[in-house]
Amino acid sequence: MAKATTIKDAIRIFEERKSVVATEAEKVELHGMIPPIEKMDATLSTLKACKHLALSTNNIEKISSLSGMENLRILSLGRNLIKKIENLDAVADTLEELWISYNQIASLSGIEKLVNLRVLYMSNNKITNWGEIDKLAALDKLEDLLLAGNPLYNDYKENNATSEYRIEVVKRLPNLKKLDGMPVDVDEREQANVARGG
């Protein structure tokens, strides 16, 4: 079996493909490497100018090694093997968008540190209960959330109750503007307020 691509190798490939210097690039695309990247390592700390780091479609099991990336705004980790939201302290103040759909996340513990998060794409993970969604309530700026494809969502969908699901999410996260790609409408907001006792 082929050895995993290292971050260092992936950066070199990116530089060759795009004719750029990775340490100066605002968007660094290391997605879909063949063979896949398995580990985020300290080489990432050299990407000082990076605002958007794309690591989707690899075999990464753990979020790590983001210290030094003080300009990071968008972290794309969709289609990996990640089980936990962790090791984001270094980017907690700057990160605005976390794209982490198609992973194996069952808990949102740790997400509350991302105080400036506006966008969270985490469809097709393993979220099963409302207690996890409640952890998002600490994120005042969160306005765009993708949850479809999680067991929690699927339970409602199977019972033709997606409108109830939407109201339940908005009840818990009143600042949301968009849920699963659809704007939160006035009607949903009113019903959520009533359900909240407002």
Swiss-Prot record:
InterPro entries, A to Z: Leu-rich_rpt, Leu-rich_rpt_4, LRR_dom_sf
LRRCT domain residues: 157-195
Site residues by UniProt (Controls the orientation of the C-terminal helical region): M182, D185
Pfam families on file: LRR_4 (PF12799)
Compartments (UniProt record): Cytoplasm, Cytoskeleton, Flagellum axoneme
Record keyword Repeat present: yes
Coiled-coil regions listed in the entry: none
Stored SMART domains: LRR_SD22
GO CC terms of this entry: microtubule; motile cilium; outer dynein arm
Segments passing through the bilayer: none
Result of altering R189E: Reduces swimming velocity
Main location: cytoplasm
LRR repeat residue numbers: 49-70, 71-92, 94-115, 116-137
Record's keyword terms, sorted: Cell projection, Cilium, Cytoplasm, Cytoskeleton, Dynein, Flagellum, Leucine-rich repeat, Microtubule, Motor protein, Repeat
UniProt miscellaneous comment: Outer (ODAs) and inner (IDAs) dynein arms contain the molecular motors that generate the force to move cilia by ATP-dependent reactions. There are two mechanosensory systems that monitor and respond to the mechanical state (curvature) of the axoneme. One system involves the central pair microtubule complex and radial spokes and the second system involves the outer dynein arms.
Family: Belongs to the dynein light chain LC1-type family.
Described purpose of this protein according to its UniProt entry: Part of the multisubunit axonemal ATPase complexes that generate the force for flagellar motility and govern beat frequency. Component of the outer arm dynein (ODA). May be involved in a mechanosensory feedback mechanism controlling ODA activity based on external conformational cues by tethering the outer arm dynein heavy chain (ODA2) to the A-tubule of the outer doublet microtubules within the axoneme.
Subunit structure: Interacts with OCAD2, a outer arm dynein heavy chain. Interacts with tubulin (previously called p45) located within the A-tubule of the outer doublets in a ATP-independent manner.
Name the UniProt record assigns to this protein: Dynein axonemal light chain 1
Originating organism: Chlamydomonas reinhardtii (Chlamydomonas smithii)
